[in-house]
Amino acid sequence: MLNLSKSSQVKTEANAQEAVHCKLPAGIHRWLHTLLSSLPFKLRINFWNQDSYVFGAEIRETLPQLSLHIGHPGVLRSLILSQDPLVLIDGYLHGLINIEGNLEALIPLIQTHPHIVIKPLQSLQLWVEAYTLPQLPFNLKAMPLKDGQQIHSRDRDKAAIQHHYDLGNLFYQQWLDPLIVYSCAHFEHPEMSLEAAQAAKLDLICRKLKLSPGETLLDIGCGWGALLRWAVQHYGVRGYGITLSQEQLVYNQQQIAQEQLANRLTVELLDYRDLPQQPTFDKIVSVGMVEHVGIKNYPTYFQAALQALKPGGLFLNHGISSSDICNGSSVGERFINRFIFPNGELAQLSTMLSVAEQTGWEIVDVDAWRPHYALTLRHWAENFEQAFDQVASMLGERKARLWHLYLIGCALAFENDYERVYQTLLRSKTDKTWNLPLSRMGWLS
């Protein structure tokens, strides 16, 4: 709850009264009509002063109607002056924009309009009218970059990981599967349950790596440890995991003790850049971690894995990639960077593979999983909706809205090929002898 001083409370109350009595300026109304005229559905906007207008395909009565309530004129003020649709997401998260109908209908609209277009002849009148509207009483801040911290430095990466993953293990348990696997599942058919699909993914990774009893397996960014425990219990390996999340470390230690795996499994709080610089592990896996590395650090990342792998070993890298070169400029990417994954960065698969080859890896296999992640995210979003009230009581209404929007938006991103995900199997170029089966089916048997 906000702790406002008496003077700030008076100012806030005055701002609220001014907002209630503020009319929608005529020029802004005309601009909205032009901007929204091509919508493929009927959109009703209910404004803060009880005014209500219909935009878009209003004559097509058979199309579903979506209703927006804009609770403060400062939303439109900020939208016009910044020309940034991220303002709409800010407003939704703060409860200043409420939606009745299908939330998904708005996400593609925002995604395909990365900038609000204002024609030169409109701009002067719009900006003047926007300035006359009351300001929002607050601004939503992104995760700040502390003085002296550089993007993808060790300290900054640790802070970014903890910003996302240290929301509490109970939070993630509300909507993930029982093993708390926070990465793409593998569905043998669309009706497969999330729990079964996650177990199938874990086992598929173990088979791709050709795990054998007694081998050592390193998991870079091991999360809550489901893959390591699966490999230890089903394939007889000795597991070693690293994470930068304190919450994940605590959970892993609890599970290791509960399942009596202390002599076969170790998890530590460690940066991948501090891995042993000599061959230590028979097999290495990294699932959903490369997105946090940063493109400029790809050589360091692939080199760290290469140095830690024993001769004849395999490295499976599972990560999200971009379908095109956006440079982090799309609305979806900026939203995720600002609120969800600070400093997350996606490259095209070709960039990732090129760096891997230049670092000294041979590419053995590339497996596309985009439809699997779309299905995974649909399961997560559905679970989250069912647990929304519990999440809101834990983290607050704003964060609950934030994560709900994030999961739906990501599902749409994979369904519409804005984002992709691949599993890449690698081995050192110095391993000249082919010690793998000749056919793909042979590896997976």
Where are these regions (language model features)?
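Feature captures hydrophobic
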Residues: 1-192, 196-198, 204, 233
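Conserved class I S-adenosyl-L-methionine
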Residues: 213-221
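Conserved SAM-binding loop of SAM-dependent methyltransferases across substrates and taxa
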Residues: 224-235
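Conserved SAM-binding strand-loop segment of SAM-dependent methyltransferases
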Residues: 260-272
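A short acidic, Gly/Pro-enriched loop at the edge of an enzyme's catalytic core
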Residues: 273-284
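A short glycine-rich, Lys/Arg-flanked "PGG" loop and its adjoining helix->strand segment in the class I
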Residues: 299-311
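Conserved beta-strand signature within the Rossmann-like core of class I S-adenosyl-L-methionine
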Residues: 312-320
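Substrate-binding/catalytic lobe of Class I Rossmann-like enzymes that use SAM or dcSAM, i.e.
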Residues: 320-434, 440-444
